[in-house]
Each structure stands twice: as C-alpha cells, then as structure tokens.
Regions:
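Glycine-rich phosphate/adenosyl-contacting loop at the front of the ribokinase-like
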Residues: 2-85, 127
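Charged helix-capping and loop-helix junction motifs
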Residues: 158-163
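Surface-exposed amphipathic alpha-helices with a cationic face
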Residues: 49, 165-169
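Conserved N-terminal subdomain of the carbohydrate kinase-like
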Residues: 54-148
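Conserved small/polar residues in nucleotide/adenosyl-binding loops
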Residues: 185-187
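Active-site beta-loop-alpha junctions enriched in small/polar residues
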Residues: 149, 180-182
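A short helix->loop->beta-strand "cap" motif at the edges of active sites that frequently abuts
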Residues: 170-174
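Active-site flanking residues adjacent to catalytic metal/cofactor-binding acidic residues
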Residues: 13, 177-179
Length: 187
C-alpha cells in the first residue's frame, strides 16, 4: 500500500437530489420539500470528510444544469472533492441527475423511497472519464470504495468499477465493496 496519499477514500458514484417533506409529513400531504444532494457512495465519504480526511467522488454532471450546480455546492460544503465530466443534456429527454422522493415515515407509516433514475447521467460512467494514473499513482488513494448500487446501474458502470478496482490494486490502494442491498430500490 502506498505510504502517502492525498485522498483517504475515493468512490465512483452517480449523484442526484432527494426531496423530503418537513417534519415527517407524508409526501402526498406536503407542498414544501427539503432538497439535498445525495448518493449512497458519498454518504460513505461523508464520514471520513467529517473527520477532516480528504475524499474524492468520481462522477458525471449535466452541463449547465442548476441541479448539477446544486450538487457541486453541496459536495463542497461537505468537504468532498469531485471529478467528473460535464455532459450535454441532449434535449428535454436527454441526461439528468437521479431524483428521489423520501417519506421519513411516522408512527405506523413506514419510511418509503421513490427513485426516478431514467436518463441518469451517472449510468454512463467510464474509466476513460478519469486520469487514473494521476489519481491513484501521483496523488494516491488510501481506499477505493465501491457500492453494489453503482456497479449494477449499467453495463458501463460495471466495467468502470472493475477497471477502477484493477487500477487500485495496481497502485496498492485497498478496495472496499458494499453490496448495499435495498429491497425497495428500483433501478
């Protein structure tokens, strides 16, 4: 393992936004929602970044999208660095960031999550999107974290995760893998 590294942990991820009604209100009863940038993988990075460790999210963004701007600002606020190409949206039916609606539940009402991932830009992640030699070889990464969610998202993300794991091994980076099973997720 490399003795010095810039990033304690890095991960490939598909960023999106989650909206949640305030005060545990049911989704169908609310017209106000709290919006946050989120992904399963950056939730893992959040722990290390909160402890002052430098972290890196490897992702893609929709060029010119206010949602992409929001995501970048939220990642900066969480002390998470990011790298990712800015991809043209390609019209109203083109690429976008994932969008999910969360009901926190209350009393007998269980928490629920509805995902909308059609046209998700993160589904197109590729190893060619990143300067692997610079990230792993020059800057250094302590741990590459992979999630079953990003690995299973598309053929492209599967190939990207496998290539990143091989690169991590080549440069002496530890690899962690979280199956991240969610019975209610619909990809």
């Amino acid at each position: 393992m490399k003795k010095t590294y810039q990033y304690a942990i890095a991960c490939p991820t598909s960023m999106g936004v989650r909206i949640t009604p305030p005060e545990r209100m049911a989704v169908q009863n609310s017209n106000l929602f709290y919006m946050q940038a989120t992904s399963a993988e950056t939730n893992v990075l959040n722990v290390a970044s909160s402890l002052g460790r430098e972290c890196l999210a490897l992702t893609k963004f929709v060029k010119g999208s206010p949602v992409a701007d929001f995501i970048k600002r939220q990642l900066r606020a969480r002390n998470i660095r990011f790298e990712g190409l800015n991809i043209e949206q390609g019209g109203p039916w083109g690429y976008r960031h994932q969008f999910n609606i969360a009901d926190s539940g209350f009393g007998l009402r269980a928490p629920r999550l509805w995902n909308d991932r059609t046209g998700e830009v993160g589904r197109t992640l590729s190893i060619e999107d990143f300067d692997v030699e610079r990230i792993f070889g020059q800057e250094g990464v302590g741990i590459l974290h992979l999630s079953g969610l990003i690995a299973a998202m598309s053929h492209e993300t599967t190939e990207c995760c496998l290539a990143l794991a091989k690169a991590a091994k080549q440069y002496g980076t530890l690899v962690s893998f979280d199956l991240n099973y969610l019975s209610l997720i619909h990809i």
